[in-house]
Design a protein with these regions (language model features):
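Secondary-structure junction motif
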Residues: 128, 156-159, 167-190, 220, ...
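Beta-alpha-beta core module
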Residues: 133-139, 144, 203-252
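Flexible hinge/capping segments at coil-to-helix
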Residues: 133-169, 260
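Interdomain hinge and pocket-entrance segments immediately C-terminal to HTH DNA-binding domains
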Residues: 33, 39, 64-83, 97-101, ...
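Central regulatory/effector-binding core of bacterial HTH transcription factors
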Residues: 70-132, 198-199
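A late-sequence structural motif
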Residues: 85-86, 156-161, 233-273
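Alpha-helical linker/hinge and terminal dimerization helices associated
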Residues: 22-23, 44-66
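A short LG(V/I)-centered, amphipathic sequence patch enriched
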Residues: 20-39
Length: 273
């Protein structure tokens, strides 16, 4: 605990004693192995976090941010799908408005990304369907839908269920299986598709499609961009498949920071172009 706070063990001990006197409660107790958080500390942690965040946000809101001269690095957790669809516009916007700004895209691991945000190791998450705490802020960006993607010289002009099931499928999945969008619908109809390739990388799929007779369900925004660049064809699925909402998530401590407000405005603009 002392190392995380950049304090000596002696200073940490004195700080804990002062807190114990002030609160009339322990917040850390020593066990046989390590220091352990007490039930009281867990009980007040959310409220204390909110108060500290409000103080930090209030103080930082007075800062001035000039994009044209700023030298800053923003860290965004996002999938390669988001990077490919939004990043194209963001690169152009930053080059014109803020040439000194740098963006670091990090892997989006759903198991750890929220903790990374809380620890201030990233500034923003752009994704869909993540569990939030009370100190997280979410803003919807756009609604996405799925389309079926083939190589352009495929003879199909309309996709029937028979054609859909007959084809070999490529799947984008972050899970260790071959199940994805629409498979629950097929199971209810006692049907299944043949998934021959599962990958966590959205941007690998268009290259695979361009050199095979397979089909893949991809988000429309990404598919439209890849279709132009790689000569692919888009068709509607033969069944209704629920889409998803892409949103950005940040810690509330950054809500009033001018540079963070500017970043979020740029992301919104990038999704609208």
């Amino acid at each position: 605990a002392a190392d995380k706070l950049n304090m000596s063990q002696s200073a940490m001990s004195h700080a804990l004693k002062r807190l114990r006197t002030l609160l009339n409660e322990d917040i850390l107790i020593r066990t046989s192995r390590e220091m352990e958080v007490t039930p009281y500390a867990r009980q007040i942690s959310d409220r204390v976090r909110q108060i500290l965040t409000e103080i930090e946000s209030t103080l930082l809101s007075k800062a001035i941010f000039e994009p044209a001269t700023a030298q800053e690095t923003f860290r965004i957790a996002a999938s390669d799908y988001v990077e490919a669809t939004i990043g194209i516009n963001l690169v152009q916007q930053f080059a014109i408005q803020a040439p000194g700004i740098r963006i670091r895209i990090t892997n989006l691991d759903k198991e750890t990304v929220m903790a990374t945000l809380d620890e201030n190791r990233i500034d923003l998450i752009i994704n869909a369907r993540l569990p939030l705490k009370s100190w997280h802020v979410e803003q919807n960006l756009y609604r996405e839908e799925f389309v079926c993607v083939f190589k352009s010289d495929d003879a199909l002009t309309e996709l029937s269920m028979e054609d859909y099931l007959r084809r070999s499928h490529l799947l984008v999945s972050m899970r260790d299986d071959f199940q994805g969008a629409g498979d629950e619908i097929l199971e209810r109809q006692q049907q299944s598709r043949q998934v021959i390739w599962s990958t966590p990388h959205f941007m690998a799929v268009p290259f695979l499609l361009a050199n095979s007779d397979c089909v893949a369900l991809l988000p429309r925004r990404m598919a439209q961009q890849c279709a132009k660049a790689m000569d692919l064809k888009l068709l509607s699925p033969p069944m209704t498949i629920e889409g998803f909402t892409v949103s950005m998530i940040w810690h509330q401590r950054n809500t009033n920071r001018p540079q963070h407000q500017w970043l979020r405005a740029q992301v919104i603009e990038a999704t609208q172009n």
